[in-house]
Amino acid sequence: MLQDAIWANGDKLANDAAYKATAVKFVAASLKGWAYCRDNAEACRDIVVAKGSKLGSSHQLWQMNEVNKLIWPAAGGVGVIDSAAWDRTAKIAQEAKNLEGKTVLTKAPDAGAYTNDIVNEALALLEKDGVDTKGDGFAPITVTLAEGGN
């Protein structure tokens, strides 16, 4: 099931060139960060820990490694939504009920609920700058969790 997303105003994306350009740059910067963390898991761990994480250093490194395994390699490019995964997620969200018997979605998402247009433009920018957006050579690192995650 797909998780996490970046949300934007569809009407503004379609009608406001500056808004769309900002969205493309924002997505490109986000994806560049994920590519950096793919190649520099320890440095990303250090950034998070230095910012005051309540979780310890080894736990943060383990978590970064696990997230990287979910993202990489990204055959279509990092951030591109696979339509089959989207359809599966929408179906689960309409059918799976919580303890109160409610679902996350009460009807199918509109046709414009997601787009790969922005991410594809962002990927083109990153590829032009030499950023590896697919991570075909990614291999997870070995992480040893310390007691208490420290």
Outline where the language-model segments fall:
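Conserved C-terminal helix/tail region of periplasmic/extracytoplasmic solute-binding proteins
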Residues: 90-150
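A bilobed periplasmic-binding-protein/Venus flytrap-type ligand-binding module shared by bacterial periplasmic
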Residues: 2-20
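Short, structured secondary-structure boundary patches
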Residues: 8-14, 78, 122-126
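Residue-level signal for threonine
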Residues: 9, 82, 115, 119
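Secondary-structure end/capping motifs
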Residues: 16-103
